[in-house]
Each structure stands twice: as C-alpha cells, then as structure tokens.
Amino acid sequence: MNPFNHNYFLGYINEVTPQFVKVHFPSSNLLEKFSHKGVFYAGGNVGNFVVIEGEEFGFLARLIELELPDGERKTISEKAIQHDETAFHPSGKAELLLSFSVFEPEKTQKTVSKYPAIGAKVYSCSDEQIEIYVKEFGKKQDEAENVYADLGKLTSNDANCKVSLNSVFGRHCAIVGTTGGGKSWTVAKLVDEVVSKTNNKVILIDATGEYSKLTSNSLTLGTDAYFPYQNLSIPDLFYLLRPTGQSQRPVLLESIRSLKVVRIAKAENSELAINTKQKAEKEKLKFYTFYQNHIRDIEDNTCNFDITFLIEQIKEECVYPSGYTNNLQDPKKWGGYDAKTYDYQTSLVGRIADLINTEIFNKLLGFKGAPAGCSSIVEGINKFITQNDEQILRISFENIPSSFSVKEITANALASFLLNLARHNTFRTNPLILFVDEAHQFLNKNIKDEFFESQTLDAFDLIAKECRKYGMFLCLATQMPRDIPIGTLSQMGTFIVHRLINELDKKSIESAASSANRAALSFLPILGEGEALLVGVDFPMPLLVKINEPDKKPESNTPKLKAKQAIPITNKISDIKK
C-alpha cells in the first residue's frame, strides 16, 4: 500500500495547530472525485479522509471545512469552475485523526505529539486504506482473538467498516440517540454479528417487546416466566418493602433470620421446625446455637424463606430483650410481647400484606408459589448458560406495568442475579454480553421510604464497574444518555451515537468519550436514520458509519397516518333518503 502516490495529490499544508491543519489546494479541480486503476477516490470534499505525508510519519485527517479566498468569491461561476483550472485556489481545514509509520503504513497510533510540517503534501485516501486502518483498531497480537463484525459502511466514501468485536464490547458499549435514529437496528445488527462470528452467548433485556422476532428462545416476565422471590437479595426485598432505617429495618432483618432458621430446621427435622419462631418468654440458647451452626446459610443475603409467614414473624420479634425468672431479670431468655415496638411496624406490615396480595407481584415473583403456566427465569438462565444449543436469550418486560416501580426493581433483581453469577467466574472462560434496551427505564432509579429516604437501584452500575474482568460485558441502548448515571456512562469504552439534538445529551457523550471531540460531535444533529458516530477507547479516530441492515429486523417501524377515504356520492344520497 502506497498512500503517497502523486496521482492522489490534492494540495499542501500551510498552517498547523494542535487540533487541525489548513490545506491549500492549487486548483479547485483537485477537489473532484476521481478513479485511478479502478480504485475510486472521493477527492477533497467536506467529510472526506485525506492522508498527509511527513518525514517519518504520515497522518490521516478528515476535511471539516472548505472555502475560497475573499478575492475569488466574486468571480465564481459555473463556466469559470469547469474551464479555468487556475482561477480558484480553495483552502480547507482538516482535523488530525491518527498517525502511521511511513515505512509501515498499516501500523497506526493516536496523534498526540506528532504533527505534519508546513508544505507537507496532502493526498486523497482510498477506501481500501480506510478499511485497513479501521480493521487495525483494537487488533490483538493473537490472531485468534481478532473477531471482526461487518458493522456498516463509512458515510464519507462507502468503505466497509469491519470492527473488532473485542474492541466494541471489551470495555462495555453504549448505543445512544433520539427515537427513530436507528438504535434498535444497531442492537439487532450487533446481536447478529456476535451470534454469527462467535460462540458467545447474548442475553437481551427487551423493554418493549420489539425484538420478539430476533429469537424464539424468549421469556416474558409476568406471562410465561417469573423471578422466584427466593432469588432476590435482601437489598432487593428492602426496595420492595421500603422499611425505615431505625425502627423497622432491624426488626425485619431479625424476622428474616428467624424464618431462615425455621426453614433449615424443617429440613433437618429439628425441634425448632415450626412455621414461625416464637420468642416471647423463650430461652435464647437453643436458637443462637442453631444460628451459629448454620450462620453461612442464614447470612447468605438471599430471601430463601417462606415470605407468607413474614407478618406473623414480625410480631414474634416484637419482644423485650430480656425476660424474668423468679421475678429477677434474666438475659438468657426473651421478654414478653412489646406492643410499642409493634406499633412502629404497622406501616411495614401493611406494605408486606399489599406486596404479597398484589396480583402483578405474585405473577412476577411467585410469593404464593409458581404462577400457573410460568417457569422460573432463574432456571431458564441457568439452562441457557450451561447448554450449547442456543446463543440468544430474550427476556421481555413488555407486560410489566410501570406502577409501584415494579419494572425497575425486577430488572435490578435480575441484574443482581447475573452480577452474582459473574462474581463466581461463570463467564470468565466464555464471556456473555448483556444487552439492555431502553436502559433509561431501568438505570438511575431511586426508591423512597415513607420518610423520603432514597435508596438507589445500582445493580447495572455495579456490572459496568466490576464485570469486565469477570467476562460479562454490558451494552446499553438509550434515547437519553443524560439519564444514565455518570458512573455507568464513564465505564463505557465504546459509543455508537445516532442522531442527538439535546445539548445536555451531547455534553454527556462528550464528557464520557474522550476521542469524541467537538468537530465530530457537530455531525450528531444532522445524522440520518441508521447513521452513527462510532467512538471509543480502541478507536483512535471517530468514525461516521451507516449501519447495515440486520438479518432479523426489530419491530420498530413508526406507524403511518393514512389518508381519509372519500365517501362515495351514492352512499351519501342513500343516507339522506333514510
């Protein structure tokens, strides 16, 4: 590959700054498109790539501005442009993107401290050369690790954009853009590429059901699947019950411990095996001895107990800390019933009763046993991970209402379950990619108790911060990047940015994606449907890409308004006669 052929010549560098260079074009004819030896070159129009020749390093740049000198603007005409090659001398501004070795043009690096000299020659860049550079982004030394996805074509010159899947997902990925910009197609395309190019598995959280045609291996929460409450973590249960910190939370925790003791005792046929653990006027020794012997199972941070007895157990926990023996205070046994402590629990008891008896929560969490016709989503995920016949699992939230924060809490519980699997190295040898569509519905959500103390649902945030090294990669798709927690957004190594209009959204991307400079972000409001700006840690320069159609398209088409049908005159006359 020889990028510095005189047949590709465009002009000379006449000004150099840390951000851009200015180019002098000896003739306006040099800006036109041309072909050489069957290879198409885009010339020197705005948005096109050019290469700049240096002594040791060459430079790839993108033209972002063209203009004529003031003295030549008044004489411009169609005839003068076409027939007088020396009448016009345009100048342009080009953004420096990356540098490469003159002796090994395939090896690229980011432009930091190297700049072209005044008088350096500028050449048009071929599609082939751009394809080679893009393919080098994120390339690993081990060839077996280099898995490439046919993501789309560059908008400037239709060069194929084959990017490394390890570069896209290795440090998590975010797909952002306003509605109708093409996010759903991009998600579907990435899923297609992962499934067709690798043996890795994909879990897709589908908020609206638009990906139903992507795979037949689907679980719809609230319809044919439920999340067993026994797999909730204690914090997840607290999100649902919202206990107050000082008066209700300690009693609730003790109630949960007691019910876990009851469950384990039943399994061992112990004398403690009753439905609720009675404490009033009872000896403490047997309980604490049993507790110490099974402390690992009891303090496992799960809700593996019979929640239908929780209200009764809360009342049993409302006792004085010490009892009496022969009219003397005895710390070895609990005291009698404490009505004042129980009064503080009445609002909590009411919330528990509402939770257990609410139909939607029973369908989702199975408080009264597995709902009819529903399978456990935990068993479904475990089966999906351990068996090799399926690569995609779609988990649909389309039938879950937004009331009571049930959608956010259930998604957070599901993310906590996957986070726990990742922490146990389930995905280290065979990484899993977790796609979250409409991520703004699940992330950056807070739950408030009756005293308006806020608790953050942070499972997805923890996945973004922890799970890269465990082999679980997160891919978020959202309309509003400003609604994603800044801690989560800053962990994203790759951004695929569709059309963005809101200034706050653009600033959130600019602050999170270091390589997305102002010149690249200026294209965001005018991007067409399916066009996106690809930026990331492993991409030395931003890429404007037209995403290819996915094999299985999501149901994201906008319903069309239809023209009103004219009423036939004969029908009008018959109506008058009636």
Model-derived regions: residue spans:
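Basic- and hydrophobic-enriched, low-structure N-terminal and domain-boundary segments
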Residues: 1-176, 190, 428-430, 445-448, ...
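Glycine-rich phosphate-binding loop of nucleotide-binding enzymes
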Residues: 146-227, 486, 508-509, 534, ...
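Loop/turn-to-beta-strand initiation segments
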Residues: 199-203, 389-392, 429-433, 470-475
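Helical "lid/switch" subdomain of P-loop NTPase nucleotide-binding domains
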Residues: 207, 211, 233, 432, ...
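P-loop NTPase motor domains
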Residues: 213-215, 229-234, 239-459
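Conserved ATP-driven motor cores of ASCE-family P-loop NTPases powering translocation/secretion/packaging/pilus
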Residues: 238-244, 456-457, 461-546
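Conserved AAA+ ATPase small/helical "lid" subdomain
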Residues: 252-274, 523-552
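Conserved P-loop NTPase motor module
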Residues: 302, 313, 320-322, 529-578
